[in-house]
Amino acid sequence: MDKKQKKQKMNSISTKTGDCGQTSLANGERVAKDSLVMEVVGTLDELSSWVGLVIAHLEDNFSSQEDILSQIQQDLYQLSAVIVQAPQVKFKKLALDQLEEHSAVLEKEMAGSWQGKFLHPGGTKLAAQLGVA
């Protein structure tokens, strides 16, 4: 899948209604922008951004890892939708199972190179970015 094909469609970035420090959830409920639910959604969004940065720096021979990371981004997006109570989105156990499977695949591919060692982020720009993600 081409990296440019993975973009999500967004209708608008502004509601033009003002906010007084509040925002609306998908179900219409108003919450403070510094509420726990918005903190969690913001953290998931930040994680997705870091994963996207890692994807952007992957070389062509890492297509299977790119597919896994792209699926993780999609899962984070859906999890955020569940958290803000979007009624049309359900985060299924299958997605959590897939996340565990992806982790196992990545661990197997790296076996022997890191297990049992304390890891320091860095070494390469991509490794440092993956450490942040």
Residues covered by each model-derived region:
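Phosphate/pyrophosphate-binding loop motifs in nucleotide- or prenyl diphosphate-using proteins
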Residues: 2-133
